[in-house]
């Protein structure tokens, strides 16, 4: 019995998007497939204490050895993908469909003289139209019941229909207007078929014309004082609007395409492929690859297509083009013809008519020609810009981004990998001591305004977020990046030097000194790092080293990590240190640098937004610093304050109606204030109805 804790993912690594998840056993077999509106909440629920889980769930999580997930664009997409995977893998713990029944569909038997609408499972018959699948039979029955208000097609069995024909009396649905009763001649078979066609068009996504027509009839009836008819048409419109759900996973019936997307950073790339056949997702594949050289995304896409479709070429001759060959003796060998037919079917199933990519390959024309030759017919390679295909491609891209994020998190969290990365970095930089603490600094601004800096801390290769710090940079230090870097490093390590002095006076070690300032930051700054990483090249490194020299700090080493080429710069060295692109040491440095950049960008955006808000508030007459502070304290954030209405601002102590309207106008414009705020009598300050 496996311990679920052995494969439990970190909660922050699980996306909050809707999606489908799979549990696999130790042999890699899928044992359970499920869907969720919020993957993080749903997947995390399986890792509660075992005694809190249901017996079936407890058995499943102790049998499993891994959990994976796929992000989709909506809950409806997750339903479709869940269905596909359950049919493909037949998981042992998905007992709802253990009888191998298909998910229920809404079928319209257009192959019959008098089409019938019904809920069906299993094999599909030629000539009929099918819509779905649905997760539950009751859901599609509710849908059909609502649709019969507008499209009263036959739903009875053949036996019931023939009995009604003989007796001349319709069934109950005919009496309550949920069937047009073609069995007794209330409507002709041709008119009934038109009703069935309308139902099929509605279910295929063409709902707006019917809703517009019913709305027009409702308005006309209301104008003629026929309120009973108007109410009936109103209910019809409501029924259609409730049942109409558009699905972007299931494309048109004729769609055969593969969707490729790549997410990458400087060192690695994640690839995701969705295979769509007959308008439905048949399969999904994903890879993580190391970028052993400096390649573009277009080159990565070219290599990817060559690898994926090269599998179809193995063991098969290129498809013949032009005139078909004549056999040696004037007749084709039956076995050979069957083999060629099978090969062609294999090619056309493996290589679809269309290949949709997130970025065009750098040899697009050659790739198209190669794929067309392999398939035996024209293949298009394109990047969709709009519509369902573009939406599905974005879903594939989101999966690639999530896969790369998860891979990096798992790689960073592995103890052996962390130890190797720290040792590699120590050896590459020639440092005497083990890297117990690393600090990284990044500067962020927009054209020299609202200049800020971030400090992130990694201890034993893991982020120590409680010791992250933010710096606001003003005055002469904000003139350029090197001056800003000098200022930040000097401010940070001047506290370290001061802490050492106090410790020496008290006769205690630095680690025993408690916080003694209002912000409680002295203790954090008391611990010096073994290594300081700055985001930048030689100028930034020189500025940081100059700050340490001015403070006479000699036990801290400084390096810079330059973007794009990922070069590591050491002070006073003419050439950079080049770490292998696949090394764990470079991966750690990149992760630390990216975290500092993220933290700096976040702080810069907050400061810029607050500055814009305070600037707008300064222009409001009668709004001084105390009331500005009260506003920010009440709403908790600048974002919430900007979204507040005048009525909500009235709840703040000391704000009257007139002042609340002025604040709302200053932050959201006159339209926002007038649309949400009540009218105010400026003479009395009273609210007007």
Swiss-Prot record:
Q: List the residue ranges of the region (Disordered).
A: 316-337
Q: Name one Pfam family in it.
A: HHH_5
Query: In the record, what terms sit under GO molecular function?
Result: DNA binding; excinuclease ABC activity
Where does the UniProt annotation locate this protein? Cytoplasm
Keywords for this protein: Cytoplasm, DNA damage, DNA excision, DNA repair, Excision nuclease, SOS response
State the GO CC annotations: cytoplasm; excinuclease repair complex
* UniProt-listed HAMAP family: UvrC
PANTHER family in the record:
UVRABC SYSTEM PROTEIN C, UVRC/OXIDOREDUCTASE
Q: How does it assemble?
A: Interacts with UvrB in an incision complex.
Name of the protein described by the UniProt record:
UvrABC system protein C
């Amino acid at each position: 019995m496996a311990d679920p804790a052995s494969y439990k993912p970190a909660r922050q690594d699980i996306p909050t998007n809707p999606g489908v998840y799979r549990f696999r056993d130790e042999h890699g077999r899928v044992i359970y497939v499920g869907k969720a509106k919020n993957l993080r909440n749903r997947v995390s629920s399986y890792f509660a204490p075992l005694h809190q889980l249901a017996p079936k769930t407890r058995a499943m999580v102790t049998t499993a050895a891994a959990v994976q997930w796929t992000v989709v664009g909506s809950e409806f997409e997750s339903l479709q993908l869940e269905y596909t995977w359950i049919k493909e893998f037949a998981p042992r713990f998905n007992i709802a469909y253990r009888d191998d029944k298909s998910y229920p569909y809404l079928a319209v038997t257009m192959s019959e003289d008098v089409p019938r609408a019904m809920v069906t499972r299993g094999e599909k018959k030629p000539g009929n139209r099918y819509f779905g699948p649905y997760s539950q039979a009751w859901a599609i029955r509710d849908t059909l019941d609502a649709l019969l208000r507008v499209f009263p097609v036959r739903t009875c069995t053949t036996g019931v229909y023939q009995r009604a024909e003989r007796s001349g009396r319709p069934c109950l649905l005919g009496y309550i207007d949920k069937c047009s009763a073609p069995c007794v001649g209330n409507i002709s078979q041709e008119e009934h078929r038109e009703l069935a066609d309308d139902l099929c068009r509605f279910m295929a996504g063409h709902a707006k014309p019917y809703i517009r027509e019913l709305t027009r009839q409702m308005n006309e009836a209301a104008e003629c004082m026929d309120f009973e008819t108007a109410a009936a048409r109103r209910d019809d419109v409501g029924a259609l609007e409730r049942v109409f759900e558009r699905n972007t996973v299931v494309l048109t019936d004729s769609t055969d395409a593969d969707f490729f997307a790549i997410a990458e950073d400087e060192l690695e790339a994640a690839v995701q492929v969705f295979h769509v056949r007959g308008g439905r997702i048949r399969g999904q594949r994903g890879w993580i690859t190391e970028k052993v050289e400096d390649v573009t995304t277009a080159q990565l896409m070219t290599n990817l297509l060559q690898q994926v479709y090269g599998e179809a070429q193995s063991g098969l001759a290129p498809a013949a083009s032009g005139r078909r060959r004549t056999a040696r003796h004037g007749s084709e060998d039956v076995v050979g013809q069957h083999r060629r037919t099978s090969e062609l079917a294999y090619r056309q199933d493996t290589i679809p008519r269309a290949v949709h990519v997130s970025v065009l390959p750098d040899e697009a024309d050659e790739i198209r020609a190669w794929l067309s030759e392999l398939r035996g017919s024209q293949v298009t390679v394109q990047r969709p810009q709009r519509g369902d295909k573009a939406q599905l491609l974005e879903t594939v891209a989101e999966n690639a981004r999530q896969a790369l994020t998860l891979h990096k998190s798992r790689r960073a969290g592995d103890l052996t990998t962390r130890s190797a990365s720290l040792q590699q970095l120590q050896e590459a930089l020639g440092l005497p001591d083990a890297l117990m603490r690393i600090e990284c600094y990044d500067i962020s601004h927009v054209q020299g305004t609202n200049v800020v800096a971030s400090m992130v801390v990694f201890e034993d290769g893991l982020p120590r977020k409680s010791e992250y710090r933010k710096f606001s940079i003003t005055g002469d230090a904000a003139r350029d990046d090197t001056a800003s870097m000098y200022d930040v490093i000097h401010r940070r390590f001047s506290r370290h030097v001061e802490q050492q002095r106090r410790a020496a006076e008290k006769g205690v070690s630095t680690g025993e000194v408690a916080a003694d300032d209002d912000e409680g930051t002295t203790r954090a700054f008391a611990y010096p790092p073994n290594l300081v990483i700055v985001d930048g090249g030689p100028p930034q490194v020189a500025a940081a080293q100059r700050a340490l020299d001015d403070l006479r700090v000699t036990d801290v080493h400084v390096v810079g990590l330059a973007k794009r080429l990922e070069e590591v710069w050491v002070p006073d060295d003419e050439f950079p240190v080049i770490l292998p692109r696949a090394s764990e040491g470079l991966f750690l440095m990149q992760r630390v640098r990216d975290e500092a950049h993220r933290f700096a960008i976040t702080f810069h955006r907050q400061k810029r937004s607050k500055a814009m808000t305070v600037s707008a508030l300064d222009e409001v007459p009668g709004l001084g610093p105390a009331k500005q502070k009260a506003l920010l304290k009440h709403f908790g954030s600048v974002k919430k304050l900007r979204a507040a209405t005048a009525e909500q601002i009235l709840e703040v102590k000391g704000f009257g109606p007139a002042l609340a309207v002025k604040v709302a106008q200053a932050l959201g414009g006159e339209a926002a204030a007038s649309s949400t705020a009540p009218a105010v009598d400026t003479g009395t300050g009273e609210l007007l109805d």
